[in-house]
From Swiss-Prot:
EC numbers, comma separated: 2.2.1.9
GO biological process per UniProt: menaquinone biosynthetic process
Source organism (scientific name): Lactococcus lactis subsp. cremoris (strain SK11)
Coiled-coil residues: none
Protein name listed in UniProt: 2-succinyl-5-enolpyruvyl-6-hydroxy-3-cyclohexene-1-carboxylate synthase
Annotated gene: menD
């Protein structure tokens, strides 16, 4: 197999609504031109001049108000598209430009008709992506091209429509095998759809199932929690609430907070399978939840977002809705009277929460109990809690329990890095509200110089530091036990945070036990300045305790 994977790409674009394709002759683009033509459903046009071809495609898109495919060969051909691309960008006209290219091994070696086509049109396109040839035995060989087609189509029609570049590196043989059955490969049982604004009748039909699940990720939209709680009550749907969604500030029977733990149970995963899934905000942090979504690959997966961008790495999205959460929730007319699916989730939640709460009896220094202690002392405050990535956000995911509260939990989950946490926390602290940073030792070391601005501007911040002397998260991952594990992954540093606190002018305290933590935290949160409460833990002991308290027993 060489370029057969492009057939589903052609099919998916047609299914989405593309009807016209414009080609300029070329060798490297042979497969693209032939596959579009042999599909026999497109209106195709050939123009020997790429510059003219691009403006011709622009005219079609302008007249019909829908994306048009524009195909060219490798090398200088794409450069001739540039004038029309700039016009499309500024006029907000949707085009999908497919630039055939030489494969990676022929780049930068003097191969003819070859130049760097990466992001060739710069800021004049809404989206750029390489459509690489997937591995022949890959599970997603036929579905991956469809996802690329969906992203291209959605990006071309986003809030500000415009051109999109999909760069297609192609290897010899360039002439494709024209098998009509290839066009249908990788099709989903539920065809992909997208909507802008309200489509209440369609969504009422899509949500006919009584097994509807709501995923609530981080989202700063106004009335986010209230809208989802209203929708959940209407649909009798459990809400799997990521800690950054702040839905755990509501002690609602619809809110689930311990799902990451109990979704480790295979029997439960089967029993809790959904028929409709609604995603709002970012995908929650839980890896087990993402695995559960992949298991529900026959469910109707509806992503609701103001922007037409993917937020589901399991690649199971069937419907994209460009809408804010309140508008969408208000458009749903369906009312479900069947509580049985919700009750299954509530039963698992209650059982798991009972197990997690046993950590309150733990005497060894353990992150899970310290998170519970932190929540207890923050409960009465109108406070802000920034949580660093790596293990800390996962500790919060496991141990932060739903309750009526005003604590706003924040995190940098855009690209999930561990840098910049102190600086971000101090930026949050400028609001004047009580502000806490929960961080790990490596995260803190990445941004020590960020503390300077806090001293300069006399900001107030309490830092709760889990120091396990290195990368504790790797003790939970597949790297645990590999050769040179400590050297390559765990990376113990042995640094003295008391000395670092003295260097940066922080008020420092080494926490000795849980009672000491409570006393020191209550003192620091009420006093001005930057306070560092260091909690030393052991990576191996923490792993053992984590397994002990998160085990779900049938």
């Amino acid at each position: 197999m060489t370029n057969e994977y492009l057939a589903p790409f052609v099919d998916e674009l047609f299914n989405l609504g593309v009807r016209e394709a414009v080609f300029s002759p070329g060798s490297r683009s042979t497969a693209l031109a032939m596959l579009f033509e042999e599909y026999k459903k497109y209106d195709t046009y050939v123009n020997i001049d790429e510059r003219s071809a691009a403006f011709f495609a622009l005219g079609i898109a302008k007249a019909n108000r829908r994306p048009v495919v524009l195909v060219c060969t490798s090398g200088s051909a794409a450069a001739h598209h540039f004038p029309a691309i700039t016009e499309a960008k500024m006029s907000r006209i949707p085009l999908i430009i497919l630039t055939a290219d030489r494969p990676a091994e022929l780049q930068f070696v003097g191969a003819p008709q070859t130049l760097d086509q990466t992001r060739f049109f710069g800021n004049f396109v809404n989206h750029f992506e390489n459509l690489e040839a997937p591995q022949p035995q890959a599970k997603n060989f036929w579905t991956y091209p469809r996802k690329v087609a969906q992203r291209a189509f959605l990006s071309a029609l986003d809030q500000m429509a415009g051109p999109v570049q999909i760069n297609v590196p192609l290897r010899d043989p360039l002439v494709p095998k024209l098998k009509s059955e290839n066009y249908e490969k990788g099709r989903y049982k539920l065809p992909f759809k997208f909507f802008k604004g309200q489509q209440s009748a369609f969504f009422d039909e899509a949500l006919l199932s009584s097994k509807t699940l709501i995923l609530a990720g981080a989202n700063s939209a106004e009335n986010y929690s209230e809208s989802l709680l209203k929708l959940a009550e209407q649909l009798k749907a459990p809400i799997l609430a990521d800690p950054l969604s702040n839905l755990r500030n509501h002690n609602s029977p619809f809110v689930m907070d311990s799902y990451d733990a109990f979704l480790a149970n295979d029997d439960l995963k089967t029993d809790l399978k959904a028929e409709s899934i609604l995603l709002f905000g970012q995908m929650p942090v839980s890896k087990r939840l993402q695995q559960f979504i992949a298991l529900n690959d026959e469910a109707q997966f509806i992503q609701v977002d103001p922007a037409l961008v993917y937020r589901n790495p399991s690649l199971t999205t069937t419907i994209m809705v460009q809408s804010n959460v309140t508008t969408f929730a208000n458009s749903i007319q369906k009312v479900n009277q069947d509580f049985s699916y919700l009750e299954k989730w509530q039963k698992a939640q209650e059982k798991m929460r009972h197990q997690l709460e046993k950590v309150a009896q733990e005497e060894n220094p353990f992150e899970g109990r310290f998170v519970q202690e932190l929540q207890k002392h923050l409960k009465a405050l109108d406070a802000q809690l920034l949580v660093s990535n790596s293990m800390e956000i996962r500790d919060i995911d496991y141990w932060w329990e739903k309750e009526d509260s005003k604590v706003r939990i924040l995190g940098n989950r855009g690209v999930n890095g561990i840098d910049g946490t102190e600086s971000t926390a101090l930026g949050i602290a400028t609001t004047g509200k009580p502000t806490v940073l929960l961080t790990g030792d490596l995260s803190m070391l990445h941004d020590l110089n960020g503390l300077i601005i806090g001293k300069t501007h006399e900001l107030n911040l309490t830092i709760v530091l889990f120091n396990n002397d290195g990368g504790g998260i790797f003790h939970h991952l597949a790297q645990k036990g590999v050769p040179n594990f400590d050297y390559l992954f765990s990376t113990p540093h042995g640094l003295n945070f008391e000395g670092l606190a003295e260097l940066t002018g922080l008020d420092y305290h080494l926490v000795s036990n849980y009672a000491d933590f409570g006393q020191q935290f209550e003192t620091s949160i009420c006093q001005p300045g930057i306070h560092l409460l260091e909690i030393k833990t052991d990576k191996d002991l923490s792993l053992a305790l984590h397994k002990k308290y998160t085990a779900y027993e049938n």
